[in-house]
Swiss-Prot record:
Region (G1 motif): 75-82
G3 motif: annotated segments: 176-179
BP GO annotations: defense response to virus; receptor internalization; synaptic vesicle budding from presynaptic endocytic zone membrane
GO cellular-component term (any): nucleus
Keywords: Cytoplasm, GTP-binding, Nucleotide-binding
Record's protein name: Interferon-induced GTP-binding protein Mx3
Pfam family, one: GED
Principal place of residence: cytoplasm
Length: 659
């Protein structure tokens, strides 16, 4: 929402006088000098603390991690945006036809105390150029643009930073972006327009940026590309201020339309519009100074019949724009501080977590290096123990190793049940054939024990290969879990990690072979048909009772009460014995095979791996080799430490800020 004239008068930060006097133009008159002094005192009292806070964060380098409040100036090519920056900063910037701003120019203005000398610095890539006079700025920026974007009309997204320190500038950060163009000319890339739009969007989409959209007064504002781009990233106009330039070029009779735009009656922006008249090309050719341009602008608006009202509303001239921008920037800083504080807190936490992954710096002393390796191996072994005991810490939506193994063992139990059920039909036919063709002198109802044994043995034998498959699956799950522990503890030490993985693989093969032998031995023992008498009797009794209950449920009476059928009775008897034994075999095999696997693939695997890791400590000569880091690890650790330090310092400064 744009403040009315009355509202403006009620704001503490209002009535700041005109922009600072440009350097090198101090002899313009006592009135201007008084205005500058008045601005300085009010600025120091009410504005400086906010700017100082952001400047201090920027000086810390926080801008490497998070966006800080700033002002970006965008506009169509030759819309007058550089002139606006020039008028605000008092520094003459590059001018000309075509694309003048070919790299983002970050203009950092720092106010010095009265009497201190003007200082400037242009920085790009790793080059710093110290400036001692404002007249050197234009050439230094052009040199930087040629260095970064090449001689010609190409653009680059690399920053050029211009630091200006002077008693006659406010503390502001302004960003001049390349002018929007639609058609490539000369040796420009064919997609120059798309490149520029992408570059501009990268800046204006940041919530921390106030967008100054510069539009000539003599064009239809609804069709301007700059305003359209700003509305895409800031649809409510919360961060956008429209600035109309070149009011002296408006066609006679269209002045009222310009007034309507400035009064926010055409394309609505919450922050509204302002209008300024900066130096034109003719003014520059006539060597009109920046201070004289401000006086000429004041006269223009005072004497213009339509635009005079805008001056009275505080919506015209560069001094009013400077006052407005100061208020907007301070308001924006205060609005951004809570979010900035949260972002710094979150970034500090994530950086701390990332730094923990890289661990501490490797000691230089050999004895300390050995102790460091002992700590790393002990941490690894503790993590392995936690896995074996089912106490490892897992992230959300992940599960512990034992949970994964339990699922496999449950599937194994289901496989046994499925296998026994699948063989029932074939068993019935086999038992029937024996009963009808091969029964010897046994009386009806007596089970041929040899047939009983053969049937049981065959069924159990079919489970051997599924047991091997489960063994291989579980081994792979355990191997993956142990490898993850190695990556967690040793990922930055490629020799130690590689040695651990090699040791892990050797032990895995050894333990898998041992487990396979034990499982096959178990199935060989299962070929001996045996069960404790009392256990078997109970199982047989249970089967008979269940069958009797089922029969009674189906027919209303048990089969024993029906007319006996010797053949059916004999078949039932055999199946009762088979089912009784299979139940006990199921209980035994479903538990014993997982026990074998846990013993060899989890318990012994872990113990041998832990012992193998401790054996690495016996060779003290290999300590340095094992602790050799990846080439970028120490650099990354240093980078994270620096980031952590500046974020911690930023947190302290934000905590002390009185606002």
């Amino acid at each position: 929402m744009v403040l009315s004239t009355e509202e403006n008068r009620s704001v503490d930060l209002v009535n700041l006088p005109s922009v600072p006097l440009p350097d090198g133009e101090a002899g313009v008159g006592e009135n201007n000098k008084d205005s500058v002094n008045n601005l300085c005192s009010q600025y120091e009292e009410k504005v400086r603390p906010c700017i100082d806070l952001i400047d201090s964060l920027r000086a810390l380098g926080v801008e490497q991690d998070l966006a800080l409040p700033a002002i970006a100036v965008i506009g169509d090519q030759s819309s007058g945006k550089s002139s606006v920056l020039e008028a605000l900063s008092g520094v003459a910037l590059p001018r000309g036809s075509g694309i003048v701003t070919r790299c983002p120019l970050v203009l950092k203005l720092k106010k010095l105390n009265q009497g201190e000398e003007w200082k400037g610095k242009v920085t790009y890539d790793d080059i710093e150029v110290e400036l001692s006079d404002p007249s050197e700025v234009e050439e230094a920026i052009n040199t930087g643009q040629n260095h970064i974007a090449g001689v010609g009309l190409g653009i680059s997204d690399k920053l050029i930073s211009l630091d200006v320190s002077s008693p006659h500038v406010p503390d502001l950060t302004l960003i001049d972006l390349p002018g929007i163009t639609r058609v490539a000319v000369g040796n420009q890339p064919s997609d120059i327009g798309r490149q520029i739009k992408r570059l501009i969007t990268n800046y204006i989409q940041k919530q921390e940026t106030i967008n100054l959209v510069v539009v000539p007064s003599n064009v239809d504002i609804a069709t301007t590309e700059a305003l359209s781009m700003a509305q895409e990233v800031d649809p409510d106009g919360d961060r956008t201020i429209g600035i109309l330039t070149k009011p002296d070029l408006v066609d006679r009779g269209t002045e009222d339309k310009v007034v309507d735009v400035v009064r926010n009656l055409v394309c609505h922006l919450k922050k509204g519009y302002m209008i300024v008249k900066c130096r034109g090309q003719q003014d520059i050719q006539e060597q009109l100074s920046l201070a004289e341009a401000l006086q000429k602008e004041q006269v223009f608006f005072k004497e213009h019949p339509q635009f005079r009202a805008l001056l009275e509303d505080g919506k015209a001239t560069v001094p009013c724009l400077a006052e407005r921008l100061t208020m907007e920037l301070i308001s924006h800083i205060c609005k951004s501080l809570p979010l900035l504080e949260n972002q710094i807190k979150e970034s500090h936490q994530s950086t701390s977590e990332e730094l923990q992954k890289y661990g501490a710096d490797i000691p230089e002393d050999e004895n300390e290096k050995t102790l460091f390796l002992i700590e790393k191996i002990n941490a690894f072994n503790q993590d392995i123990t936690a896995i074996v005991e089912g106490e490892e810490i897992v992230r959300e939506k992940e599960c512990r190793l034992f949970t994964k193994l339990r699922k496999e063992f449950f599937l194994w139990s289901e496989e046994i049940e499925r296998n026994f059920q699948k063989g029932s039909d074939a068993l019935y036919k086999e038992v029937y054939t024996f009963e009808m063709q091969y029964r010897g002198r046994e009386l009806p109802g007596f089970v041929n024990y040899k047939t009983f044994e053969n049937i049981i043995r065959r069924q159990i034998k079919t489970l051997e290969e599924p047991a091997m498959e489960m063994l291989h699956k579980v081994t792979e799950i355990v191997r993956a879990a142990f490898t993850t522990v190695s990556e967690k503890n040793f990922s930055e030490f490629f020799n130690l990690h590689r040695t651990t993985k090699s040791k892990l693989e050797d032990i895995r093969l050894e333990q898998e072979t041992e487990a396979e032998k034990a499982i096959r031995l178990h199935f060989q023992m299962e070929q001996i048909i045996y069960c404790q008498d009392q256990i078997y009797r109970k199982a047989l009794q249970k089967v008979r009772e269940e069958e009797a209950e089922e029969e009674e449920r189906k027919h209303g009476k048990s089969r024993s009460a029906q007319s006996p059928n010797l053949q059916t009775s004999s078949m039932d008897e055999i199946f009762q014995h088979l089912n009784a034994y299979r139940q006990e075999a199921h209980n035994c095999i479903s538990s014993h095979i997982p026990l074998i696997i846990q013993y060899f693939i989890l318990k012994m695997f872990a113990e041998k791996l832990q012992k193998g890791m401790l054996q690495l400590l016996q060779d003290k000569d290999s300590c340095s080799w094992l602790l050799k880091e990846k080439s970028d690890t120490s650099e990354k650790r240093r980078f994270l430490k620096e980031r952590l330090a500046r974020l911690a310092q930023a947190q302290r400064r934000l905590a002390k800020f009185p606002g």
